[in-house]
Structure formats: structure tokens, C-alpha cells
């Protein structure tokens, strides 16, 4: 048992790193934006490239691990993750950084599925296995919670590059720990990798993300965006058709007929999408507008992280006693309430204590949902399909992160552009100055998107009060976009909570080995 606990610790260290990188970079976005002259679209890709590659091949990597050996694939993935971290840490520009993040996502996708599969192999007793899976689920929530705090401390002490050197050091430590403590396991009867399904699914997801992000500059009516949306639709249809007829599908779509499988998968998607609104845009706004340091942002997010951890621990106990239905519903309610309370508090001159407390309430809600959502999906399938189920819910989470990077980003900057006119019109300046400012609107938006506001303010400091008013108008428009993202996120989380209340049973469901869907 002691050896099993040591191996579990090694596996959870690797899991922690792969999930940490969903949020740890968010606090460093303002710093790297200034350093690399990156646009907001490029920042979206810094986040989205990791989530996209993670989500696109996670299920396939799980199948490869089952066939070739889970430990081998995990170690290979950890090595790729470390290589991507080095590429990011040394990146001279935004495109190289985005490429490095994509490489890290590939490594994470190869590493993560095996962590759960090996746990099922190590712990043969039902009770011990359940406890180990509970630890596994809690660690993923812990990583999500601590990301902004760790990122803020690293950025404050060094720079955004410190985040990736941190990844390298702990990635190598996790690789060595897994190599030494985790036994090899494989399934000699495992199905061959569904290459066609992987291609169709990954292609559809990538085309959709490219389309939405490209629409921010080209518009949804542009030929390029329409073509990408068409490609995404065709590939998605091909994926569904292939998976229905494949002998060993990448994702058994029959399970989506079960509300208790589909419901928590949708909740996972919505909560990760909404989490992106907090970690990406709040951190970016605080860096760019009040010009907070990494340490200050870490302090703002610290109460949220603590409440996420407490919520996750409490949810494990609550779910064990009452099932996943009400913990998920309550968690979504707390998450949405935190978003709605925090929204008006995000201003150019924020009151940090109320903002931190509102984000802490949202964090408690996020923490409460993590464990029961995973438990609900695992309860909906027989034990031999738990690996697929866990990978499916994690894929839903990563797709939510991809959607957050693309959809919310498009919303924020379309709203910024739409409201900037009204804010400029409200300025108390001569009509001629207003006309000049309106003519410079594209430049103002570009300055906000590239984090160069202070640079341009200094350049035109001789304009006195006029430039100060322009600054206020620009930041107010940016705030309008951020608020729109928060309101949309809160609405999605509320709908997810209602869905959980309807689809999840009142008590923990047993493994559905006799379910007709599995025939």
C-alpha cells in the first residue's frame, strides 16, 4: 500500500502540472504582452493553443497508452511538456510562445489520461480505488485554484518567463518520480487508436477556434470566417458519422443518450468557459488598467484559490453522502453569484477587498463543482469504461477553455468597439476634438489590444486633460466588454446548474453495467 501511495503522489504531481497550466499563465499575460508586443488575439492563442491541443488528442493518447503502455506514454508526454516549457521560456516573440504552448498541450494530453488509468490498475479494492480517484479529482481542482497565485508570485519575483522555468523544474521532477515509482501497465486487448476520429474531431475544433478568433478582426461575414465555419461543420459531421460506425470509437457517442452522462459533461464545459472569464480577462484588465503587479494580482486571487480548495474538499464529503446533484447545483449557484457580484467591482480604480471576496465566492462555487462532476460521469458508465468517461469530462473542460479563449475574446472586443463611440461622444471636449478622436478609434482599440496604453499616453502627454479623458473612455469601453463576458458566463453557469438539478440523480448511482446503451 505504501508503494501505491508513493506512486499516487507521483501521478498526482504530473496531473497537477498539466491542469495548472490552464490558469498559471493568466497572471503573466500583461507582462508578456508588453515584453513581446503581443496583441490580445495572440494572448488568446497563448491560452487557447494549450487547451486546443490538450483537448484535441487527449482521448487518442489514452487509447495509445492502453495499447503501448501507460507509463511509456506518460513519460513521453512529460518529456514533450518539458520541451515545450523550454521553448516558451526562451520565446523571442509571440508566435514562438504560441508554438511552445501547443507543444506543452501535446505533452499534457499524452500525460494526463494515464494518471487515472494507472490508479485503476494500482488500486484493485473498490473502496481504495474510490478514495484514490477522489484524490485525483481533487488535485485537478487544486491545480486550477493555485494557478493564478503561483503565476502571480512567479511574475512578481522574476517575469512571465519564470512560469515556464517553474514548469520545467517540476515537470522533470514529476517525470523522474513517475519513472521510479509507477509500474507499467497496458491492456493487451486494447482497441487500436481511432486515427480518423482523432483527425475529424481535432480538425473541427481547430477550425472553429480559428474562425471565432479571426472574426474579431475580419468579421463573421468575411469569406475566410465563413469558410472556416463550413470546414468545422463538415468535420464535426464527419466525426459524428465515423464514431457511430467505428468498431472502437474514440468517444462512444451512445453515452450521450444518458442525461446523467451528458449533463455533467455540459456543466464541465460551461464552468471552464466561465472560469476563463475570471482568469484571463480579469488578470489582463488589472495589469493593463490599474497597472497592478504580479504580487498584487496574486493577492486578489489568493482568497479565491483558498475557497476553491475548501469547496473541493467539502464537495467530496457532500457528494459521498448525498450524490452529485445538489453539490453541482449549489456550486453553479455560488459561481454565478460571485461573477455577478464581481462584475461591477472591476473598474479602473477597483476596491480590492470586495473584489477579492466576490471572486472568492466564485472560487468556492468552482471548487464545489469539480469533484461531483467527475464523480457523476464515472457513475454513469461501467468500470471498464471509466477511463473513457474521465477523459471525456476532461476534454469537455478543455473545450470549454478553448471556447472561453475564442468566444469570450470575440465578445469582449466586439463590445469594446461598439461602446467606444458612446464613451467618446460623452467626453466634455470641443466637437472638433471628438471628431479627431473618433477618427483615431481603430488606433485606440489597437493600443488597448496590444497593452501599449501607457506608452501612447506618455507620447501625447502634452495634450493634458484631453488625453486623460481619452484614456478614461478607452478603459470604460474595455470594462464594458469585460462585463459582457462576465454576464454571459454567469448566464451559462446558471443554466448549467439548472441542467444538473434536472439530469443528476438524488443519490450516487452505481456502475451501469446492464445499461442497454452499452449493448
Question: Where are the model-predicted features located?
Answer:
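Transmembrane core module of solute transporters
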Residues: 7-53, 159, 196, 224-228, ...
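Transmembrane-helix bundle of Major Facilitator Superfamily
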Residues: 1-180, 315-316, 322-324, 343, ...
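Small-residue-mediated transmembrane helix hinge/kink sites in multi-pass secondary transporters
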Residues: 30, 62-63, 151-152, 209, ...
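Hydrophobic transmembrane-helix bundles of small-molecule transporters
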Residues: 134, 156-268, 274, 292-295, ...
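Generic alpha-helical transmembrane segments of integral inner-membrane proteins
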Residues: 52, 56, 79, 83-87, ...
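Transmembrane-helix exit segments and adjacent C-terminal regions of multi-pass membrane proteins
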Residues: 1-11, 15, 375, 438-519
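Helix-loop junctions at the membrane-solvent interface of multi-pass transporters
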Residues: 61, 83-91, 157-158, 180-184, ...
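C-terminal module of multi-pass small-molecule transporters
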Residues: 8-10, 57, 69-78, 94-99, ...
Amino acid at each position: 500500500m505504501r508503494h501505491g501511495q508513493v506512486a499516487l503522489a507521483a501521478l498526482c504531481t504530473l496531473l497537477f502540472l498539466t491542469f495548472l497550466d490552464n490558469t498559471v499563465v493568466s497572471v503573466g499575460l500583461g507582462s508578456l504582452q508588453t515584453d513581446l508586443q503581443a496583441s490580445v488575439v495572440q494572448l488568446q492563442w497563448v491560452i487557447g493553443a494549450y487547451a486546443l491541443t490538450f483537448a484535441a488528442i487527449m482521448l487518442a493518447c489514452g487509447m495509445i497508452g492502453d495499447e503501448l503502455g501507460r507509463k511509456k506514454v506518460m513519460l513521453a508526454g512529460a518529456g514533450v511538456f518539458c520541451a515545450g516549457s523550454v521553448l516558451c521560456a526562451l520565446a523571442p516573440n509571440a508566435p514562438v510562445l504560441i508554438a511552445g504552448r501547443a507543444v506543452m498541450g501535446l505533452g499534457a494530453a499524452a500525460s494526463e489520461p494515464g494518471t487515472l488509468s494507472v490508479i485503476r490498475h494500482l488500486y484493485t479494492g473498490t473502496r481504495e480505488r474510490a478514495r484514490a480517484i477522489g484524490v485525483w479529482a481533487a488535485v485537478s481542482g487544486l491545480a486550477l485554484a493555485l494557478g493564478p497565485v503561483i503565476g502571480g508570485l512567479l511574475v512578481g519575483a522574476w517575469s512571465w518567463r519564470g512560469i515556464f522555468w517553474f514548469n520545467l523544474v517540476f515537470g522533470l521532477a514529476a517525470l523522474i518520480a513517475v519513472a521510479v515509482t509507477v509500474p507499467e501497465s497496458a491492456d493487451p486487448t486494447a482497441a487500436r487508436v481511432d486515427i480518423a476520429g482523432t483527425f475529424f474531431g481535432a480538425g473541427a475544433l481547430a477550425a472553429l477556434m480559428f474562425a471565432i478568433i479571426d472574426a474579431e478582426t475580419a468579421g463573421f461575414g468575411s469569406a475566410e470566417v465563413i469558410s472556416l465555419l463550413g470546414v468545422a461543420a463538415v468535420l464535426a459531421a464527419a466525426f459524428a458519422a465515423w464514431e457511430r460506425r467505428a468498431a472502437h470509437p474514440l468517444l462512444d457517442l451512445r453515452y450521450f443518450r444518458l442525461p446523467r452522462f451528458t449533463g455533467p459533461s455540459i456543466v464541465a464545459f460551461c464552468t471552464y468557459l466561465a472560469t476563463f472569464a475570471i482568469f484571463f480577462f480579469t488578470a489582463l484588465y488589472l495589469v493593463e488598467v490599474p497597472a497592478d503587479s504580479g504580487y498584487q494580482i496574486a493577492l486578489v486571487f489568493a482568497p479565491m484559490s483558498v475557497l476553491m480548495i475548501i469547496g473541493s474538499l467539502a464537495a467530496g464529503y457532500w457528494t459521498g453522502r448525498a450524490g452529485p446533484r445538489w453539490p453541482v447545483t449549489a456550486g453553479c449557484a455560488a459561481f454565478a453569484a460571485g461573477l455577478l457580484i464581481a462584475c461591477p467591482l472591476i473598474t479602473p480604480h477597483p476596491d480590492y477587498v470586495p473584489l477579492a471576496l466576490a471572486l472568492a465566492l466564485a472560487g468556492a462555487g468552482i471548487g464545489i463543482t469539480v469533484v461531483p462532476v467527475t464523480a457523476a460521469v464515472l457513475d454513469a458508465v461501467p468500470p471498464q469504461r471509466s477511463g473513457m468517461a474521465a477523459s471525456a469530462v476532461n476534454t469537455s473542460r478543455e473545450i470549454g477553455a478553448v471556447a472561453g479563449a475564442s468566444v469570450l475574446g470575440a465578445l469582449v472586443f466586439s463590445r469594446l468597439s461598439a461602446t467606444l463611440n458612446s464613451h467618446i461622444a460623452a467626453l466634455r471636449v470641443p466637437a472638433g476634438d471628438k471628431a479627431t478622436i473618433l477618427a483615431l478609434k481603430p488606433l485606440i482599440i489597437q493600443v488597448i489590444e496590444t497593452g501599449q496604453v501607457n506608452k501612447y499616453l506618455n507620447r501625447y502627454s502634452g495634450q493634458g486633460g484631453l488625453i486623460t479623458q481619452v484614456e478614461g473612455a478607452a478603459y470604460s469601453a474595455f470594462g464594458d466588454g469585460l462585463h459582457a463576458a462576465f454576464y454571459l458566463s454567469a448566464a451559462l453557469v446558471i443554466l448549467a446548474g439548472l441542467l444538473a438539478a434536472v439530469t443528476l440523480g438524488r443519490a450516487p448511482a452505481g456502475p451501469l453495467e446492464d445499461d442497454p446503451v452499452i449493448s
